[in-house]
Curated annotation (Swiss-Prot):
Binding site for ATP: 14-19, 71
Entries under PROSITE patterns matching the protein: GATASE_TYPE_1
Record-listed L-glutamine binding positions: 356, 384-387, 407, 473
Source organism of this protein record: Polynucleobacter necessarius subsp. necessarius (strain STIR1)
Gene Ontology MF terms: ATP binding; CTP synthase activity; glutaminase activity; identical protein binding; metal ion binding
Family according to the record: Belongs to the CTP synthase family.
Binding site for CTP: 13, 151-153, 191-196, 227
Name the UniProt record assigns to this protein: CTP synthase
Listed transmembrane segments: none
Function, as annotated: Catalyzes the ATP-dependent amination of UTP to CTP with either L-glutamine or ammonia as the source of nitrogen. Regulates intracellular CTP levels through interactions with the four ribonucleotide triphosphates.
Sequence positions that bind Mg(2+): 71, 144
Other observations noted: CTPSs have evolved a hybrid strategy for distinguishing between UTP and CTP. The overlapping regions of the product feedback inhibitory and substrate sites recognize a common feature in both compounds, the triphosphate moiety. To differentiate isosteric substrate and product pyrimidine rings, an additional pocket far from the expected kinase/ligase catalytic site, specifically recognizes the cytosine and ribose portions of the product inhibitor.
The gene coding this protein: pyrG
Length: 558
């Protein structure tokens, strides 16, 4: 029978509940347990798909096509299991389900209320999500509740967790509370009062934390932990210090060294083998001891909040681990390029344009792509980054000078990128959309397999088939592909049914490494395995760096 660990947060948000939950899951998995994770989001949106990245951060896409919270990306990077749609749900989904049941008459005329109807629905969603992977036989389900204790939005979720802990047998439920212990410079000490108040608020709801994770910028001394224990009524050995580190991949070892996994196993009466965190130790060692260093220019429009590109940033770091390279990322606002030109792109080892939506900043991205193409700088375009690479090539090489996307110009004379109105989803069902369709869940979403053209760079990277996750509405327009191909562009993969371009590249005679993909490869990269595309990209950056250095040395001699 599955046992549950609820992870809550207090004092402030963004303390790292997702990292804490994923790290605990990684330790338990290393002990031979089957672990799954759930994210319970208190916002009323049905999913984060229509939310601005500047508000919410990245939207992580699961294999089965769900638009979910970015924490699910952390989950997949820390454990071996792949998350599903039911591993993330929101207040919006809960109310949508309850209201649908009420309309169908399932409540038999009763007054529908937060307690018991909403809280019971939350519990049903939790139990369903816990069965989503491992053939429904997970040993432990770690459930992260979004927001902080005291938020009105989180109360139904906390109440549902409290009810669930009462309903389940003894030793089947534990609570982990992550809280802030701030350091006050003027006083020269860590302050425990916010943690005390946060735990007090949790106890008022009826929840007693099993473990306290105390977040600070430095390790909390023993006397500080003892004080927190005394005033919070949590055993001292269960007060765990979590401090700032240079990489999140150090967190599993940090928690294990303080015995957190033993505490949880005892509380849940789990019989597990000793933890083996050697894979994490190796990753941390590789990150700390690189043999090379490159600088990648990431040209986007959400760069002021790097959480917007969380999986992409991590994928580049994973590639660095697997190529023994320190990867520095220079975040460049594409609107700055529109105002000030491309001088900021000089001295970069490679350029990457990530996915995005809307017209703002696109001409700056196109200018960056042109710079990369004309100066032989390795280029990787992802989703919109591929579409813009096609537009740039069409305008400046294929003599389609008015080339554009109907996303930016619905009346474009040369729509080399356009809205596709009908396609088959990953299950083979026909999906349709138009300009008047709702924005939510009207994209090509989830994994899709495609054959890869032999003899291409794509084939060298992926082999005969690619299976990656998608999130986009617009596609390269097949009407213009013959003209683009006559000008040298290579379409190296197409969807098997609609034959829509999935990957594009330039031949080595035109550019040493110029590559675009319609999908999002960052969603399948993990620190343990890396990802072949990002490893190839970093290798291309290293090769470009060597050529530049050789050229400079040659010029110096002459």
């Amino acid at each position: 029978m599955t046992k549950y660990v609820f992870v809550t947060g207090g004092v402030v948000s963004s303390l790292g509940k997702g990292i804490a939950a994923a790290s605990l899951a990684a330790i338990l998995e290393s002990r031979g347990l089957k672990v799954t994770l759930l994210k319970l989001d208190p916002y009323i949106n049905v999913d984060p798909g229509t939310m601005s990245p500047l508000q919410h951060g990245e939207v992580f896409v699961t294999e089965d096509g769900a638009e979910t919270d970015l924490d699910l990306g952390h989950y997949e990077r820390f454990v071996s299991a792949k998350m599903r749609k039911s591993n993330n749900f929101t207040t919006g989904q809960i109310y949508e389900s309850v209201i649908s049941k009420e309309r169908r008459g399932e409540y038999l005329g009763k007054t529908v209320q937060v307690i018991p109807h909403i809280t019971s629905e939350i519990q049903a969603f939790v139990e369903r999500g816990a069965k989503a992977i491992h053939d429904g036989k997970a040993d432990v389900a770690i459930c992260e509740i979004g927001g902080t204790v005291g938020d009105i939005e989180s109360l139904p979720f906390l109440e549902a967790a409290r009810q669930m802990s009462l309903r389940l047998p003894a030793h089947d439920c534990a609570f982990v509370h992550l809280t802030l212990v701030p350091y006050i410079n003027s006083a020269g000490e860590l302050k425990t009062k916010p943690t005390q108040h946060s735990v007090q608020k949790l106890r008022e709801i009826g929840i007693m934390p099993t473990v306290l994770l105390c977040r600070a910028d430095r390790p909390i001394p023993e006397d500080g932990r003892a004080k927190i224990s005394l005033f919070s009524n949590v055993r001292e050995e269960a007060v765990i210090s979590v401090w700032d580190v240079d990489t999140i991949y150090k967190i599993p070892e940090m928690l294990h060294a303080q015995g957190m996994d033993d505490l949880i196993c005892r509380e849940l009466d789990l019989k597990a083998q000793p933890a083996d965190l050697s894979v994490w130790a190796k990753l941390v060692y590789e990150m700390a001891n690189p043999q090379h260093e490159v600088t990648i220019g990431m040209v986007g429009k959400y760069v002021e909040l790097t959480e917007s590109y969380k999986s992409l940033i991590e994928a580049l770091r994973h590639a660095g681990i697997h190529t023994h390279t320190r990867v520095n990322i220079n975040y460049i606002d594409s609107e700055d390029i529109e105002k000030e030109g491309v001088d900021c792109l000089q001295n970069l080892d490679a350029i990457l344009v990530p996915g995005g939506f809307g017209k703002r900043g696109t001409e700056g991205k196109i200018a960056a792509i042109r710079y990369a193409r004309e100066n032989n700088v390795p280029y990787l375009g992802i989703c919109l980054g591929m579409q813009l690479a096609v537009i740039e090539f069409a305008r400046h090489v294929a003599n389609l000078t008015k080339a554009n996307s109907t996303e930016f110009d619905p009346q474009s004379d040369q729509p080399v990128v356009a809205l596709i109105t009908e396609w088959l989803d990953r299950e083979g069902r026909v999906e349709k959309r138009s300009n008047d369709s709702d924005l939510g869940s009207t994209m090509r979403l989830g994994s899709q397999r495609c054959p890869v053209k032999a003899g291409t760079l794509a084939h060298r990277i992926y082999g005969a088939e690619v299976n990656e996750r998608h999130r986009h509405r617009y596609e390269v327009n097949n009407t213009y592909v013959p003209q683009l191909e006559r000008s040298g562009l290579i379409i190296s993969a197409r969807t098997p049914n609609e034959e829509l371009p999935e990957m594009m590249e330039l031949p080595s005679s035109m550019h040493p490494w110029f590559f675009g993909v319609q999908f999002h490869p960052e969603f399948t990269s993990t620190p343990r395995d890396g990802h072949p595309l990002f490893s190839a990209f970093i290798s291309a950056a290293l090769e470009h760096q060597k050529k530049l250095l050789k050229s400079k040395l040659h010029k110096g001699k002459t």
